């Protein structure tokens, strides 16, 4: 999902598909590449749950994140994602996204992250799932004020992309899709890339300023930590005397409701979804019988009776082989 162009997939214009890009993507130089937006292995929450389970078997230490575009009803989807075992639900707003997206998508598709974050947060609380997942917000977050608002609406993590790009030298020429970026960022042209003058320290400094502004807002509100700010929509106020009369007719009370006061439910590491991987056949049989052979990097043989309830059989053990032996076969 992408907030800038939901349902359209990623676009890589043919002009930017240089030979080394084409080789990586198994394509032909100069051919436009469009990533298909639908995931044909995910047509239901059950399909998503199976994929998350498979990924968790591949890497037990992984924190699985699912990205959702802010839209009406995203709270229901977020609840399903939490039940499927994801640890992070990312709500992506319409303002952000790649500069190579079609202009019609950038200006006319998607909804603000504020609506999606508030709905997801409140729906997860109503279903008793809020402590299981982290809510992350992204989509043109630019300042500490944006972070404070996102936090008060229910987010615990925050994604930045456009603002750090500007800190690295992006001058917002809106030519990301043309391979003519004058700052040398959104281009594969070797000559233009020489113009890139960004440094990691620039982003570090920018983030320090964002954090400082957030601290100032928290001080004004009397909030000591970010955790205490999560979900405090009651601290937000609707602006009055807006420029347009149409905006004054909006009712934002649903977004700002908080019946929990200072004790707003939010992510608790102790309540993370338990996949019970220790009960799988991989851990109970393969690791038990072949663990010593794995540590000594010797071959082993084992006959196991597998049933349909042994999902992703061999995946977890295979991940341990790669972790200990690397992903290349010995010469």
Named regions from a protein language model:
Residues 1-29, 154-244, 248-249, 253:
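Mobile "lid/hinge" segments at catalytic clefts and subdomain interfaces of large enzymes
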Residues 7-8, 18-55:
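Conserved catalytic alpha/beta cores of large enzymes that bind or transform nucleotide phosphates
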Residues 13-16, 67, 82-98, 223-280:
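Terminal amphipathic helices with adjacent charged low-complexity linkers/tails
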Residues 28-32, 57-58, 96-100, 185-196, ...:
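Short acidic (Asp/Glu) and glycine-rich catalytic loops that position anionic groups and cofactors
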Residues 39-194, 309-310, 314-319, 324, ...:
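Glycine-rich phosphate/ribose-binding loops and adjacent secondary-structure elements
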Residues 247-331:
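Charge-rich, low-hydrophobicity low-complexity segments
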């Amino acid at each position: 999902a992408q907030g800038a162009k939901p349902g359209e997939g990623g676009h890589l214009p043919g002009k930017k598909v240089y030979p080394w890009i084409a080789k990586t993507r198994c394509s032909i130089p100069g051919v436009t590449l469009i990533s298909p937006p639908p995931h044909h292995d995910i047509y239901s929450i059950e399909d998503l749950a199976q994929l998350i389970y498979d990924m968790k078997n591949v890497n037990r230490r992984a924190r699985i994140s699912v990205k959702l575009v802010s839209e009406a009803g995203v709270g229901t989807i977020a609840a399903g994602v939490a039940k499927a075992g994801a640890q992070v639900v990312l709500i992506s707003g319409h303002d952000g996204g790649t500069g190579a997206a079609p202009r019609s998508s950038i200006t006319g598709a998607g909804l603000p992250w504020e609506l999606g974050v508030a709905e997801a947060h409140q729906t997860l609380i109503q279903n008793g799932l809020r402590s299981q997942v982290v809510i992350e917000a992204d989509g043109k977050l630019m300042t500490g004020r944006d972070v404070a608002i996102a936090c008060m609406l229910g987010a615990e993590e925050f994604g930045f992309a456009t603002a750090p790009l500007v800190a690295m030298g992006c001058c917002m020429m809106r030519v990301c899709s043309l391979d003519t970026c004058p700052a040398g960022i959104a281009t594969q042209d070797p000559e233009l890339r020489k113009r890139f003058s960004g440094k990691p320290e620039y982003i570090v400094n920018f983030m320090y300023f964002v954090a400082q502004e957030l601290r100032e807002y928290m001080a004004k509100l009397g909030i000591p930590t970010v955790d205490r700010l999560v979900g405090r929509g009651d601290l937000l106020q609707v602006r009055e005397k807006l420029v347009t009369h149409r905006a004054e007719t909006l009712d934002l009370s649903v977004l700002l409701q908080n019946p929990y006061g200072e004790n707003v439910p939010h992510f608790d590491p102790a309540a993370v979804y338990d996949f019970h991987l220790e009960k799988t056949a991989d851990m109970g049989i393969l690791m038990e019988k072949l663990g010593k052979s794995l540590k000594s990097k010797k071959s082993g043989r084992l006959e196991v009776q597998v049933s349909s309830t042994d999902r992703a059989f061999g995946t977890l053990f295979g991940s341990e082989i790669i972790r200990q032996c690397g992903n290349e076969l010995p010469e």
